[in-house]
Amino acid sequence: MKIKLFLITLMVTTGLFAQRTPETIQSKKLGNRTFTVVTPASYESSPEKKYPTLLVLDGEYLLDPFEGILKYGAYWDDLPEMIIIAVNQNYGETRFADSEFDEAGFPSGSGANFFEFIGQELYPYVDKKYRTLPFRIIAGHDTTAGFLNFYLYKDNPVFNAYISLAPEMAPEMEKRVAERLTKITKPLFYYQATGEGDLKEINEKAAELDANIKVIPNATFKYQNDAFKGASHYSLVAKAVPNAIYFVFDGYQPISMVEFQDKILKLDAGYTDYLIAKYDELEKRFGFKIKPRLSDFKAIEAAILKNKAYNELMPLSDFANKHYPKTTLGTYHEALYFEKTGNYKKAIKSYQKAFTQEAVREITKDFMMNRAEALKGKPDEPTEDAPAETPTNQPTEKTE
């Protein structure tokens, strides 16, 4: 009996955690190469969902810090779930061979082979086997951080975001990276970090690259440089990884109390447009669709009620029906519009439509029927000047 209970518990809990899968690929350029693929917690339970990817060089020791912050951020819906590809390089002289470059500062020998392996063999293998999205991040440390910059030398870079931690740069890289960034037109993110206690040569070249990037006029890319006081070559990684990931996904987070108070409530109009624009911009920036959060609908509803902009409840209803069809969400906003503008008969009919719809959080069928019942017998009083209502449910930091 205890064994059966253990097996049942194991099957139930297995789907709650990310899964690590060791992989081996027979490369035409490099022979056998091993790597680890980490799929997110929802991978098995959401078979239609696709995920952006993070390629971690020096995977033996960089995987854990990146996986940790991504799992934490995904729990709070601050960060998207991702597939992580961690390449093993820390045996013998492999990481140095993989990053080999010539006197001119370009990949050569085994470095050129590794460069092509990632784009021509590794990613095609991963894309075929796993449900991936085109948005790709690459991260590395010292030697491999310098190596990842080579992908910016291509006219159509393989990656959308670059995380360079204490980079050891090839000749002229501090100039070439900045030059390449001026010519790339697609959305791109570049993050660099150094530690005060690191080697002088690493910090000087990184500072020169930072200076070159900062003078680029009309930059079309996102850039952040962190120089950590008191950090060593190794301790800077723990400081930089959260900063880097949150830099790349800045704006992805749900509407916070600060955003609600300082931006949304201060609008004269266009509350629903604000919500629509937020998710349109996220899709444009990251190249994948993000389903609008229920907490964000609640935030916009609260702003509409606070500012008596009741006409905006109808476009909010349309937006809800688009993303949550056949649920009570859009119907609730429609009914609330009629109620707030004194059209009680229409409000009752709208509330009653929820009887055949799927409930969304607290907007249950009973909740909607009770709202309808409370309006029965009230004569219509159509008006656009209904009294203001102070919302009791403002957005919170915790979302489901």
Question: Model segments located where?
Answer:
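Non-catalytic cap/lid and distal C-terminal segments of serine-dependent acyl enzymes
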Residues: 19-344, 348-383
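Long, low-complexity, intrinsically disordered segments
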Residues: 387-400
